């Protein structure tokens, strides 16, 4: 909030190699992706603020539009993993700003802890985190 404090923080970031990005208003979602390449599977988007499945009502008052937005979120997560050549699993963090999906970051080693976005996504998709982890160990 303080201009000098902000400038000092930016200088500190330059020294340590931190990344500073523009804040984007919107619905923040985490999307777990399992698999590699074209065989990857996208799990249901998780609302980061509630750590629960994204409510279609939050995306749009129209069910048809909300489903199209969810599909776009899932497509974006899939394409990010494909473009980066990620293997086996990842957690893609995105923002729906009301007009488009924006990528925030990708976690190549997300938390599998109970209540984490990855675990909630697995549970929402009908998968147990234990089963997913056993599958990943066997790869």
Model regions and ranges:
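Phosphate-binding site of ATP-dependent enzymes
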Residues: 3-75, 80, 96, 101-102
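Short coil/turn linker and secondary-structure boundary residues
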Residues: 1-4, 127
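ATP-dependent carboxylate activation and anion-phosphoryl transfer catalytic cores
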Residues: 64-139
